[in-house]
From Swiss-Prot:
Gene it is expressed from: rplJ
Family: Belongs to the universal ribosomal protein uL10 family.
Keywords per UniProt: Ribonucleoprotein, Ribosomal protein, RNA-binding, rRNA-binding
UniProt name for this protein: Large ribosomal subunit protein uL10
Cellular component, GO annotation: ribonucleoprotein complex; ribosome
Organism field: Klebsiella pneumoniae
Subunit structure, as described in the record: Part of the ribosomal stalk of the 50S ribosomal subunit. The N-terminus interacts with L11 and the large rRNA to form the base of the stalk. The C-terminus forms an elongated spine to which L12 dimers bind in a sequential fashion forming a multimeric L10(L12)X complex.
Amino acid sequence: MALNLQDKQAIVAEVSEVAKGAL
């Protein structure tokens, strides 16, 4: 299942937020 660019950006944003919270 291919993700479009907006989906990828949204996932990256979520992962970044989680990573910041984990630090």
